[in-house]
Amino acid sequence: MAQQVNEWLIALAVAFIRPLSLSLLLPLLKSGSLGAALLRNGVLMSLTFPILPIIYQQKIMMHIGKDYSWLGLVTGEVIIGFLIGFCAAVPFWAVDMAGFLLDTLRGATMGTIFNSTIEAETSLFGLLFSQFLCVIFFISGGMEFILNILYESYQYLPPGRTLLFDQQFLKYIQAEWRTLYQLCISFSLPAIICMVLADLALGLLNRSAQQLNVFFFSMPLKSILVLLTLLISFPYALHHYLVESDKFY
């Protein structure tokens, strides 16, 4: 009986590693988003219950001996969880970068605040975009999609097996980084163009009327232009999420 309980505890510990590693990168599962670390751990524990019998049947005790072979098992689980969390966090990092870029161009970087979603200092637009994307993520079934990926990863990469770090893996990571910057630039590009045109117009105005302090009007004017541009371009920028939401429901 004691040995069986010990095996179940070891299976629970192994099943907990991959969701925990996922939560360290995915903003929605961080302790700042859920309110407390204890609540986050409870949510992660509930995510491990569906896969607990599968891991128990794999006899994880056979991988754990006195030769520290369990270190390879833990390392593989952490790497897989980090990779899933990294891929899932790319859209959230992209919109936060886009918001910080817009606030930098309009001269409002002094108004940084703490974003509990990503647990870091961010700009006003970065916080707005992050919160907006969280809503879109939940209503479009994004959380269910992440959980499906997490559970299917145990089918293709069960505990004891890890990823193959070859040229294809490096190309995949490079593609994810490229996607991160592409999302950031494409999301903020309409507002960036408006602010660049506003700077050009203010520069010409300052050259024709040098006694007028155009920098006093620069930040309010660019802020208004950014807000109007975002209101117009939001339906197009989030078209993919709206389409996926319609398919899901």
Please place each PLM-identified region on the residue numbering.
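Hydrophobic alpha-helical segments and their helix-loop boundaries in membrane
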Residues: 1-249
